[in-house]
């Protein structure tokens, strides 16, 4: 089952409160209090619902309500509490005596929220209180540097480096062009000829080395053959002498 309406729909007045209605509500609450908001309009003689009477009393008719604009300190407190509590307007109102949750919600959506959004869009971590931009830095010793000047400085450095690189390329090309003349090509030809001569010398040395190896091999072979020859000669003479000593018969 749904909740029963707080009052009968027929005959209930809506819209802004008149001063006479406000005075009737104030007098009744001063005399009897507000223990039961549902029954209060009927006992007070008001053609209003209980919810309307409660909101009218809490947000406008209470004697301890502060009147007038919010001070910069109150606005700063609302901003800080909203960062931690969010849209819990009743909890925020409990930290600000004399201010209602409805009033705090209205001032947040009409002034503070738009002001913070504008400051964030400008790119700064600033909090605008009473029309004054207060820049908050986590590091008190940090130095604020103009980003535009830094960008201009970096662009100038880049341009200088590029121009220097191009200048070096141009100078090197001119130097090479100045060096490439007839003497350069004659030097290249002489170097080429010298390389060919060196290659011929290397081939000649390799041929001599191979021939020397062959000669040494042939000489060693001839030497061995001579030794065998003379060995055979000596052994044959010795055999002849032995046979000559045998007596004749």
Curated annotation (Swiss-Prot):
Entry GO terms, CC: nucleus
Signal sequence extent: none
Gene3D superfamilies assigned to the protein according to its UniProt record, in alphabetical order: Homeodomain-like
Residues of the DNA-binding region: 37-61, 89-112
Tissue/organ expression: Expressed in imbibed seeds, hypocotyls, cotyledons, roots, seedlings, siliques and flowers.
Knockout consequences: Increased tolerance to freezing stress and higher accumulation of CBF genes and downstream genes under cold treatment.
CDD domains hit by this protein: SANT (cd00167)
Entry-linked Pfam families: Myb_DNA-binding
MF term (GO), any: transcription cis-regulatory region binding
GO biological process: positive regulation of DNA-templated transcription; response to cold; response to freezing
Induction comment from the UniProt entry of this chain: Induced by salicylic acid (SA), jasmonic acid (JA), salt (NaCl), ethylene and auxin (IAA). Down-regulated by cold treatment.
InterPro entries per UniProt: Homeodomain-like_sf, Myb_dom, Myb_TF_plants, SANT/Myb
Annotated keywords: Activator, DNA-binding, Nucleus, Repeat, Transcription, Transcription regulation
Domain HTH myb-type as annotated: residue spans: 9-61, 62-116
Places the protein is found: Nucleus
Source organism superkingdom: Eukaryota
Motif Nuclear localization signal, residue range(s) on this chain: 198-205
Database matches in PANTHER family: MYB FAMILY TRANSCRIPTION FACTOR, TRANSCRIPTION FACTOR MYB14
Function description: Transcription activator that regulates freezing tolerance by affecting expression of CBF genes.
The protein's name in its UniProt record: Transcription factor MYB14
Gene: MYB14
């Amino acid at each position: 089952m749904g909740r029963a309406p707080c009052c009968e729909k027929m005959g209930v007045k809506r819209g802004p409160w008149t001063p006479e209605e406000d005075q009737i509500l104030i007098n009744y609450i001063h005399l009897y209090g507000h223990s039961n908001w549902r029954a209060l309009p009927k006992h007070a003689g008001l053609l209003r619902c209980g919810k309307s009477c409660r909101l009218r009393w809490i947000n406008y008719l209470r004697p301890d309500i502060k009147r007038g604009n919010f001070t910069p300190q109150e606005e700063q407190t609302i901003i800080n509490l909203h960062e931690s509590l969010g849209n819990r307007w009743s909890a925020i109102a409990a930290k600000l005596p004399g201010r209602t949750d409805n009033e705090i919600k209205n001032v947040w959506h009409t002034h503070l929220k738009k002001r913070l959004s504008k400051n964030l869009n400008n790119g700064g971590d600033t909090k605008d209180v009473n029309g004054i931009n207060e820049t908050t830095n986590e590091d008190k010793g940090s130095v604020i540097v103009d980003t535009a000047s830094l960008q201009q400085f970096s662009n100038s450095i880049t341009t200088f480096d590029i121009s220097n690189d191009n200048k070096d390329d141009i100078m090197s090309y001119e130097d090479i062009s100045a060096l490439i003349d007839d003497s350069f090509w004659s030097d290249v030809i002489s170097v080429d000829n010298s390389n060919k001569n060196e290659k011929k010398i290397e081939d000649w040395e390799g041929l001599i080395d191979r021939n020397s190896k062959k000669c040494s091999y042939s000489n060693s072979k001839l030497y061995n053959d001579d030794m065998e020859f003379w060995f055979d000669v000596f052994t044959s003479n010795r055999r002849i002498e032995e046979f000559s000593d045998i007596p004749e018969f």
